[in-house]
């Protein structure tokens, strides 16, 4: 709040006994603070291939936690790269839970390079997200293999530029 930020991204951390229970307790503690201060807490599930022993690498359990917390100020950062690496990317699940998503990250996989360098169909994914009422940010978080301007072609194809 003091920084003037309307949202902050946090990680869940390493896997530990009772992790899900502890995360739920922490989110419920944060809920009234976030709502009072009108700040959004955004949780990012990371794949446990790149980040060994990461707790809750799949989107579905995080969506379930967010439904239990039931706050418009606590959401998920849906990183398509991480979910694809886990073999768990599902555009239907994204669309069903779009109200629980506060931010997207984009990187192709494997390799975490620009869209079009791997196996993720970002043009169609972004078009599908565009059909929802999502109005948040989509962060481009990749290691470019081309000049920056050349890596934005997928945005034009998805009618985002």
Sequence positions of predicted segments:
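Histidine-acidic metal/acid-base catalytic patches
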Residues: 4, 28-29, 40, 56-78, ...
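Structural motif corresponding to the early beta-alpha repeats
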Residues: 1-25, 35-36, 135, 142-145
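Active-site-proximal beta-alpha loop/turn segments in soluble metabolic enzymes
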Residues: 9-17, 43-53
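Flexible, glycine- and charge-enriched loops at secondary-structure boundaries
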Residues: 16-23, 52-55, 115-118
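N-terminal/domain-start segments enriched in small and hydrophobic, helix-friendly residues
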Residues: 23-43, 48-51, 144
């Amino acid at each position: 709040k003091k920084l003037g930020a309307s949202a902050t991204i946090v990680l869940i951390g390493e896997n530990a006994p009772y992790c899900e229970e502890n995360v739920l307790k922490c989110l419920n503690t944060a809920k009234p603070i976030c709502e009072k201060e009108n700040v959004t807490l955004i949780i990012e599930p990371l794949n446990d291939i790149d980040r060994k022993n990461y707790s809750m690498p799949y989107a579905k359990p995080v969506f379930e936690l967010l439904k239990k917390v039931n706050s418009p100020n606590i959401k998920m950062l849906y990183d398509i790269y991480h979910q694809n690496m886990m073999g768990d990317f599902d555009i239907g699940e994204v669309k069903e839970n779009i109200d629980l998503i506060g931010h997207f990250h984009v990187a192709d996989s494997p390799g975490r390079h620009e869209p079009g360098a791997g196996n993720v169909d970002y043009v169609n994914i972004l078009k599908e997200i565009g059909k929802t009422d999502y109005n948040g940010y989509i962060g481009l978080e990749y290691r470019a293999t081309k000049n920056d301007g050349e890596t934005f072609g997928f945005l034009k194809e998805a009618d985002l530029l």
